[in-house]
Amino acid sequence: VPPKGVSM
């Protein structure tokens, strides 16, 4: 799960 604010 990517960090909040990162679109992946």
Swiss-Prot record:
<keyword id="KW-1222">Bradykinin receptor impairing toxin</keyword>
<keyword id="KW-0800">Toxin</keyword>
<keyword id="KW-1213">G-protein coupled receptor impairing toxin</keyword>
<keyword id="KW-0878">Amphibian defense peptide</keyword>
<keyword id="KW-0840">Vasodilator</keyword>
<keyword id="KW-0838">Vasoactive</keyword>
<dbReference type="GO" id="GO:0042311">
    <property type="term" value="P:vasodilation"/>
</dbReference>
<dbReference type="GO" id="GO:0090729">
    <property type="term" value="F:toxin activity"/>
</dbReference>
<protein>
    <recommendedName>
        <fullName>Bradykinin-related peptide Pnor-7</fullName>
    </recommendedName>
</protein>
<comment type="function">
    <text>Vasodilator. May target bradykinin receptors (BDKRB).</text>
</comment>
<comment type="similarity">
    <text>Belongs to the bradykinin-related peptide family.</text>
</comment>
<dbReference type="GO" id="GO:0006952">
    <property type="term" value="P:defense response"/>
</dbReference>
<dbReference type="GO" id="GO:0005576">
    <property type="term" value="C:extracellular region"/>
</dbReference>
<keyword id="KW-0964">Secreted</keyword>
